[in-house]
Amino acid sequence: ITGDVIKHYQKYCNGKRAVAFCTSIKHAEHVASEFRAAGYKAVAISGESKRSERAEALAGLREGRLQVVCNAQLWVAGVDVPQIECIMLLRPSKSLTFYLQAIGRGLRVAPGKTHLTVLDHAGCIFEHGPPDMERKWSLQGRQKGKRATPVRQCPACFCAHAPAPVCPECGYRYPA
């Protein structure tokens, strides 16, 4: 699932503060190690990390001393770092709650921040649709079955977007 995450981070978010959601502690440590090898300030944290290590990672990201925090099932909710400009989904999930909460870590407004970039290496968008997609919420539950998500992925820039004849990110025209 890690794939070309370093290359994509360099291309789309170089130097921006980012949080990576990983599959396990070992995976988070591996991804953080790869980022460090590429010259970035990165750490891995998890529920097994000491409270002081988690607090230091949070402060480091807030203050800009860290560029990437790789976490294993830790920062899904309750973390407020408005400066986060990149979310990396490096684990698949059938949970809409996880998906929206993970992306929500980067949706806070901050001075100078113009947008959030989501590097979805796990294909969560194809399971759940775009995070800003209208959803029907109900306390009655819903029927189980395959959910159709209206998403198209540009072959030129890999942007995932609502179906359209032209990619809104790079202008690629899809064949008719």
Tell where the protein language model's regions lie, with residue ranges:
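Residue-level signal for alpha-helix termini/capping positions
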Residues: 10, 14, 36, 62-63, ...
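Short glycine-/polar-rich loops that comprise or flank the Walker A/P-loop
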Residues: 38-41, 82-86, 112-117
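Conserved helicase ATPase core of P-loop NTP-dependent helicases/translocases
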Residues: 19, 27-76
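SF2 helicase motor core recognition
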Residues: 68-88, 95, 103-108
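Conserved interdomain hinge at the start of the Helicase C-terminal
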Residues: 1-34, 142-149
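Residues at the C-termini of beta-strands that transition into short coil/loop
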Residues: 46-48, 91, 122
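C-terminal helicase lobe
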Residues: 63, 79, 96-101, 105-176
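Alpha-helical elements of the RecA-like P-loop NTPase motor core of helicases
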Residues: 3, 29, 33, 55, ...
